[in-house]
């Protein structure tokens, strides 16, 4: 049995229209990123079932029936993607915003552009070419106006977290909460772990690992050492101790713990900032997620051990366990505890190691500032090992200015921290940005912008305490973010950075290896949400 030509044409037309309608009424609205393989299964079923029906009703061999339904499927997708492309190119709310033509069509345009450079460099190039607001995806804008930081991230902002934060679904942590009320409630639990009393306890716990770090650095005096490696070993050992009550022993083994290596291998995918639906495809494939499941199992064991330990000096996990009042957690509570413990390790280690490495880079480039820092520290008593108590050095102006200036030029999270605009949209410098759009303010670009700072490319710590006129928009400086989702671990990170750098400059002379002036060392930096500095060679010599 065959349908008349006119009937067959009408059928194809209706199928094509169905594709258009599915885009306009469904895929264009709401979020559809969590279960990409569910759509694949549904489409497979929708194609397979009609094939069987056509074969039975029309009496066709399955092959011929499959050709017919395959044609319908192609027509459906032709309608869907024609509607999608026309909408994105011509009728999208962001149609009038400048940016590369390819970015209008697909979120993969930016990902493809990151094959040979990190995101923060690519975004700098785009802003240099197109201006302060650039369309970098079908529904994504990068905004380099200093005023936008408060509008997008500030306490009064009505913007909310994007689908990017669902990449680890179903695992939850403080970082991944998209619902503001749920996030605020969880943050209150976390906040008890970052008060002054808790920080003094952490300072005591950290001393052990800093002593190991300096023992290793002493062993390498006069040699070229990759300081980035040692800061990574140190930071992961510290945060392992604060998350689980036990370190990863990386300073002892001089290498990455296997679980940390799995973690580092896994974050490579983040450097491409692929759309959330595609990220979900990768992480749900068994062949690609096998190591991730090993890491989760390892974390589960570490958390169970920690829950059974009684620590003399509390760690961060003690604050997270306190609401349980000694009872066993429910499965949901355990998953949240595990997500938060992993957050302590990942967020606290990578960013702190990068910040320390960046500070050393600038110390080696600016020996005159090193002398000023030493003059500031000289009147302050250190212990026999050269350790300074944080409360003694926390308000030193040049030390804080040096750290601030380093983080301005080398922000640990340099580019994409995405938010969704509220339904009514937002206004930035007289420009209306429609609701439901993903926006972000790249700290790397803004930190080097003459709209935010005078002489933005010059390294001048005094701008933070002696020459405030060199800062046009103080609120644009947000290396730890700002607003309700700002980094809750900022006090711990700054304590660690200040005390480590103070001891470092009072113990060693720091210089680049012979023939190296440091001008190219920051060219091979990665951006996988947080900045990654794989190689930073320096030579340390003992001070007299």
UniProtKB/Swiss-Prot annotation:
Pathway: Alkaloid biosynthesis
Predominant subcellular localization, coarse grouping: membrane
A Pfam family the protein falls into: p450
Enzyme Commission no: 1.-.-.-
Localisation: Membrane
Keywords associated with the record: Alkaloid metabolism, Glycoprotein, Heme, Iron, Membrane, Metal-binding, Monooxygenase, Oxidoreductase, Signal, Transmembrane, Transmembrane helix
TM stretches of this protein: 42-62, 66-86
Applications: Notoamides have been shown to exhibit antitumoral activities. Notoamides A-C show moderate cytotoxicity against HeLa and L1210 cells with IC(50) values in the range of 22-52 mg/ml, but the IC(50) value of notoamide D is greater than 100 mg/ml. Moreover, notoamide C induces G2/M-cell cycle arrest at a concentration of 6.3 mg/ml.
Membrane topology annotation: Multi-pass membrane protein
Signal peptide: 1-22
Taxonomy, superkingdom: Eukaryota
Any one GO molecular function term: heme binding
Protein name: Cytochrome P450 monooxygenase notG'
Native species: Aspergillus versicolor
Encoding gene per record: notG'
